[in-house]
């Protein structure tokens, strides 16, 4: 066991974890934050995307101990304390950028990273940036529309 100390959604957390614990396991099983999903377990689908020190990472191939001393934001940490949705979350809802919802947390986290860290907004850039996120239900049209609307709202 090793002591892991980090901030998750603004809250300081310290737990003993086995060295091989994946970040997604720590988030879901230890902290019970189940918005981050496990889809493929091979970093291909993007359902497990979280922010590690402000950058999108796939938590299914990141060891929890790699996040020691870092700040992790999950989908639960995007909304305001009063429950007001983050502009990107609101855009996904408004544009119907989801169907079953399984991929949505990872899509939203990737989209927020795209806008904050890369400033990409046109359709081609959005589609390229979301290549690491798979949705098995939609044709991506509404997802791209949601990202563009969310980006515009985040710019205000």
Description of each model-found segment:
Residues 1-156:
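Signature of N-terminal electron-transfer/Fe-S-associated modules in redox systems
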